[in-house]
Every structure is written in C-alpha cells, then in structure tokens.
C-alpha cells in the first residue's frame, strides 16, 4: 500500500472520486465541502445496513454531537464531524476494521486534513470516544434485534446508555437521507455560529 507521504507528494491530481455536485475530491489533495459531506453521510447506512430502519452516518453524527453537548463531554462540533472522513471512504463495521488494517491508514489520510480544515484536535478526544460509544448502544437499543445485550464496551458505557436511553434529546429518528442531510446541515450551522 502507498503511504500517505508518498501519496501527498504526487503532483498529478489523478486520484479522485466524483462528488454529488459533479466536482472532484482529490485523495492526495483533499478539500472539504460541507454540503457534499452531508449528502454522502446521509446516504450511508450504519451497521452495514443490518438495522430495522435506515439509519445514516449523518444522523449518528448529530447524536454524538448532542451527547457531547448535553453530557458535557467536550466540543459538540467535534462530535458532529468525528465521522466526516466516511463521506469519502464509507462507513465500515468495526469487526471488518480489525481485518483491514490498511483501512485505518486510509481513514487517517483523510481525517488528518479534515480535522485541520475544521479546526479540530488532531485526534479524537476521550469525550468524543465516550459519546460515540454511548451512541452505539443507544442506536442498537432502538434499531437492532439483539439490542446490543451481548456486545462489549468500555467500563460504565452500558450503564450510562441505559440511564439516558429515554431522554428525548437522544432519540434516534431513523431519518430518510434527505431529512438526515438537512438535520446534519442545520446542526452544522448552529454549531458553527456558536463557535464564531
């Protein structure tokens, strides 16, 4: 696999994906358009689609941001953008990531520039990781047959998720893509205004 330094050193802009707007996202020279990201994230179903209703990466990201805000786990904008790289590399279920170590390298190639572009910490904060874990269990309780009862988690996550699962601000709506896109963009606007 080509390493990030070699990839970014390439002068030619031949490694790209076409975006929903007809533009090009150059893998070795990434630039970020929030509307393009929102569209892609809204059209990707989490859990490899194995949920009772369509549930997007965009809606998940809003939930993580709300968890960070209401539970005082850190900057909710980080929560909103924590899976932003998936707009360009797709969401892959965690067990596959164990078997695909190069996926993490590819993710880092997009995530580093994305975090810099949006003025986020270089790596995920512990608060964002906690909110992501909580979201996982809140989502599973509402969208999966198993309710995640047999899943493992860091200490305290399952108990905390159980405590907050019925709070209205953490409700999972299972929005269709167009609504999920709008939901994400509204949250982005609100949080961007608060950061200004």
Which sequence ranges carry the predicted segments?
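Metal-dependent phosphohydrolase cores
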Residues: 1-196
């Amino acid at each position: 696999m080509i390493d990030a330094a070699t990839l970014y050193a390439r002068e030619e802009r031949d490694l790209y994906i076409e975006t929903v707007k007809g533009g090009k996202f150059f893998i070795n020279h990434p630039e970020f358009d929030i509307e393009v990201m929102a569209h892609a994230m809204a059209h990707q179903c989490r859990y490899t689609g194995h949920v009772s209703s369509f549930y997007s990466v965009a809606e998940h990201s809003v939930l993580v941001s709300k968890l960070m805000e209401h539970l005082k786990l850190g900057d909710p904008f980080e929560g909103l953008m924590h899976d932003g790289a998936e707009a360009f590399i797709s969401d892959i279920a965690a067990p596959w990531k164990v078997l695909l170590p190069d996926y993490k390298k590819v993710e880092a190639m997009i995530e580093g520039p994305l975090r810099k572009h949006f003025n986020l910490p270089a790596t995920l904060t512990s608060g964002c990781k906690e909110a992501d874990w909580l979201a996982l269990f809140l989502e599973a309780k509402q969208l999966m047959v198993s309710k995640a009862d047999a899943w493992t988690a860091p200490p305290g996550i399952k108990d905390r998720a159980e405590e907050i699962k019925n709070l209205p601000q953490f409700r999972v709506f299972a929005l269709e893509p167009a609504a999920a896109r709008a939901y994400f963009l509204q949250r982005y606007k609100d949080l961007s205004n608060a950061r200004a």
